[in-house]
Amino acid sequence: INFGCPVKKVVSKGAGAGVLKDVDLMVRLTKAVVNSTHLPVTVKTRLGWDVDTINIEEVALRLQDAGIKALTIHARTRSQMYKGEADWEYISKIKQNPNIEIPIFGNGDIDSPEKALEYKQKYACDGMMIGRAAIGYPWIFNEIKHFFETGEKLPEPTISDRLLAVKQHAEWSAEWKGERLGLIEMRQHYSNYFRGISHFKEFKTKFLQVLSLEEF
């Protein structure tokens, strides 16, 4: 259950991080889901609505009592959106609470294998969730896994690797949305896949003109 989305159009409907203003409602919603499925239910949320209403410890305890099997904490408030640094000290505090027994996953600002290992060791979380850093860069998960296991960094994906990933993404998008609409929606992803590639601008116009899978 995502109680962490800070986007205005979501929050304005009382969804996502908007539920942080009403913990009782959050608990009722969570219990309803837990009681309606045999599957394990997990929750993602934020520290609180703003700096004056940080309530993550209460939320963690009450959601645990509601029956969730794990909690992911994005270490910012809703009012922060994605600005400033995520404050993982709150995650550490939750992990140190002897009354909280469910796995706690940290989220926010993990964008490299080195930072992932540093934060895991420093804040003792049970795992991590990665969001923005994986947009257009799905290799980050394997890079982190490899770094944890060996202490070595994998080489960055080549241009060919990126092209293959874009093609696969485009095929899935076309399968899901239909070829024309799926490829139009792909336009928002090309820059992310080729972030940091100096000569990508030369090909961007061609990518934006692609309207069929055959053109890949």
Write out the residue ranges for each language-model feature.
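Residue-level signal for pocket-adjacent positions within structured domains
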Residues: 5-6, 14-15, 77, 105, ...
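Active-site beta-loop-alpha junctions enriched in small/polar residues
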Residues: 4-6, 44-50, 74-78, 107-111, ...
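N-terminal small/glycine-rich loop or linker at the start of catalytic domains
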Residues: 5-15, 30, 34-42, 47
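Glycine-rich tight-turn/loop motif centered on a GG-T
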Residues: 8-26, 79-88, 152-153
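Short coil-to-beta-strand
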Residues: 2-3, 63
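Active-site mouth loops of central-metabolism enzymes
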Residues: 19, 45-56
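Alpha/beta catalytic cores of nucleotide-metabolism and tRNA/nucleoside-modifying enzymes
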Residues: 28, 36-38, 52-70, 82, ...
